[in-house]
Amino acid sequence: MAVDPRKVLPTKINLIRLRRELAMLRRIRRVMEEKREVILHYITSMAAEYVRYQREVYSELERIYQNYYLGVAAEGIERARAFTAPAEGSLEVDVSTRTLFAVKTPVFSLREETVPPLPLPAGSDPKLVQSILDMRSILDKLLKLAEYEETLQRLISELKDTQRLINALDYVILPSYQNAIKFIKLVLEDRMREDFVRLKIIKRKMEAKTQ
């Protein structure tokens, strides 16, 4: 998008065209700056929300694992492993998207039918049973946490792209247009001066002939 003054014909038409394009680019820059500020505000707000939610989920996970290890200690490793063996395998997640400031961000939802049922024999240690049930219930929160992380990464990437565009406008594109306009104006002004001098010379010659 940058303009090389040496490759632009110094004409009035090009001067008008470049001025119009420069005005349009300045409007684009203002829009980009507004977009940058909105994204930055949203990232700041979401980052704070993410940190709060992460602490909540990690605290809950810590409690679940504490109960799990206590339950394993009570039941024995082999018996506890027999409880969780049916859960081995892959869970499936549906991924959709939503748009924030022209940025596509993910929405994760667990496919319930892919979550295997866990056998919990009567008489099992209560802490082990509770930890297994809680682990199942926290899956949605873990997906929500992953949503936060991926959304923040995409917004930060968009922020960087927006800033790069603003920098390109500020340091390359806009200056090139300004220099091209300045160059054309100087050439046109020189031509006007030359035409003025030429007309004066012609006028003097014509006056000399009439005398």
Swiss-Prot record:
It holds the Pfam family ATP-synt_D. It is a peripheral membrane protein. Gene3D superfamilies: 1.10.287.3240. GO terms for molecular function: ATP binding; proton-transporting ATP synthase activity, rotational mechanism; proton-transporting ATPase activity, rotational mechanism. Its main location: membrane. Component of the A-type ATP synthase that produces ATP from ADP in the presence of a proton gradient across the membrane. This is A-type ATP synthase subunit D. It comes from Aeropyrum pernix (strain ATCC 700893 / DSM 11879 / JCM 9820 / NBRC 100138 / K1). The gene is atpD.
